[in-house]
Amino acid sequence: RPFYIGPNDLNLIMNLRAAGIDHRKFMRMIEVYADITAPLYWWKEYDTYKVGTVANSCSTMHKIAAKEFTLEDFSCEHLLDEESLPPYEERVDIDHCEPLAAIDVNGQWCYYTPKTFLKMTCHVLNHFRELYLKTKEKKYWWQMIQLLPSSYNQKRTIMLSYEVLANIYKSRRHHKLDEWHTLCDWIEGLPYSEMITGKSEEESIIDKINSIGNVYVVSPGEARAAEEGKR
């Protein structure tokens, strides 16, 4: 570890942490800086944490036309594409399904996957980007701003405290969004993360092993309790 806290001080810290927010004011004074790239739909949830945080972002308003749009600019790993769907003739999801259909330039009906729609959105965004770069007319800028999907990834530099991280970890550890799980895994890797999570280092290791699946590890205390229960 890059930092070291003596066992007596660490024991005092954990007791104060367990005593509640009023007794662990020191956690508000431990600051963390990080660069995070995440989709706008995740930042919308993160922005509910207003107290004890500061963020500086790459401005979408000013930088939206700075580069060409590609799929790599979006969090789209869960979008269905051709590889994740059955062959066309076996697909039942497109039967008479107008939301998945569109007419191509030849007047033919086509059915699209969600990822294909995102690719089309990229093409449209790039079309208006080129027009905006050529003309500087704001109406083309508006097309990009209002068409931009919430899966667009934005980078921010954030500053927050161990106390804020403790609140995040408690309320978001089992959240539906994968991005929160990734952040909580990162939190567990911070120096003396037991201040944040409330778990001992041994418990954190056991949780990580159990999260792999097909295995369940118990602590020595749990093993003793189980053994006593058999008697």
What does each model-found stretch correspond to?
Residues 1-231:
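Family-specific signature for flavin-dependent thymidylate synthase
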